[in-house]
Amino acid sequence: MKGMFRTGLILFAAAAAACAPRERTLVLLSTNDMHAKIQNFPRLAAAVENCRDTAQLVVLVDAGDRWTGNAYVDMAATPGMPMIALMNRLGYDVATLGNHEFDHGQAFLGRMIDSMAFEVVCANVTSDTCTFPQLPPYVVLDKDGIRIGFVGVVTNYEGPGHPAGNASSFEGLEFPDPQAMAMKYAAELRPKIDLLVLVSHMGDDRDVELLGKETRFDVVIGGHTHVTVS
């Protein structure tokens, strides 16, 4: 009986260890407003690969405005494609839209999204046109058992009612309030995931304003206003 009791303790201890949560390190790396600065990509790629060599789990995210700003990229046979090719090769996971994604029209952007090997999410753009795909508002990634939700939003403040840019680029599209849509999907996702990330192209002032109203986001990855956050 004494030997059986010891065996029972060992089995119980093993079962308890198997059920205990594992401690893992997750690193979120982000870019925003790269504006086709292709000359900086080697340094970016080196930093990302170095992090992947040292961290257990790495997720790479972009918060919009990937092209418009460099003649080589903007005058390529397919404007913007050199940046997308490099982003695909580096292995981005998730991105949202910036206002400059619309610079060459909806049909062009739709084709570019098809060429992106990463998830593109935006919760506050709806389309009734056949030239622009209806994007998912969010995506959930599972990284070694950690469920991470990414909600994307883009500014609609400069239009007003749509992002900054030529109004003809936005015909047939609607851009509901990005903060309201972020809050809607935060409420929907929060019970289902471990980590909730907002990928925002609203600007730092609007991001801070949102965080005063919405506490369910664990991380905000922002862009649009080109502000360095320390």
Positions of predicted regions on the chain:
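Bacterial N-terminal signal peptides that target proteins for export
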Residues: M1-G8
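Hydrophobic h-region of N-terminal signal peptides that target proteins for export
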Residues: I10-A20
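Acidic, metal/ion-coordinating pockets
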Residues: C19-S230
